[in-house]
């Protein structure tokens, strides 16, 4: 298990107040926690791994507009938008043989994805939503969470024997 707390600040100039302000840096989560468990059978033929991650909330940049209908954000007492914390779960099962092993795993088993990760990326034309990267509001830098759902993978490991 591990836990990280980060208090990253930056100085910004507020033209309305005509002064510098010390604020949380955008898109930096305040905390991250990881809990991992692993079990290997007594004959060492199977191994089971499970990892849970807890990713903390963070401030969004000035001017960020919360997507309509999204519940992934909140506004603090100073009017700043923040993304909420989110969990992730990862797992893997491995079957060992003498010189090789095969494994099956999954990532993002909570299936958490960020709502509308690319700001201003679509326009409506004749009832269809089209991608418009030339739009003046297009911004792909607001990524703070996974943009893909769960993934399943299968793999193979081969160990070369060494002469001792």
Residue ranges: model-predicted function:
Residues 14-23, 64-74, 118-128:
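Flexible, surface-exposed loop regions and adjacent strand-edge segments
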């Amino acid at each position: 298990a591990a836990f990280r707390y980060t208090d990253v600040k930056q100085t910004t100039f507020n033209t309305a107040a005509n002064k510098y302000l010390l604020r949380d840096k955008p898109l930096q989560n305040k905390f991250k926690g990881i809990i991992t468990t692993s079990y290997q059978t007594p004959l060492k033929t199977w191994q089971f791994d499970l990892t849970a991650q807890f990713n903390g909330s963070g401030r969004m940049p000035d001017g960020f507009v919360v997507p309509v209908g999204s519940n992934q954000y909140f506004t603090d007492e100073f009017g700043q938008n923040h993304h909420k914390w989110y969990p992730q779960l990862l797992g893997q099962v491995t079957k060992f043989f003498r010189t090789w092993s095969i494994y099956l795993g999954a990532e993002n088993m909570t299936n958490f994805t960020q709502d509308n990760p690319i700001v201003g990326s679509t326009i409506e034309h004749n009832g269809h939503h089209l991608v418009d990267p030339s739009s003046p509001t297009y911004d792909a830098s607001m990524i703070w969470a996974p943009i893909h759902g769960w993934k399943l993978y299968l793999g193979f490991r081969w160990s070369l024997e060494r002469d001792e």
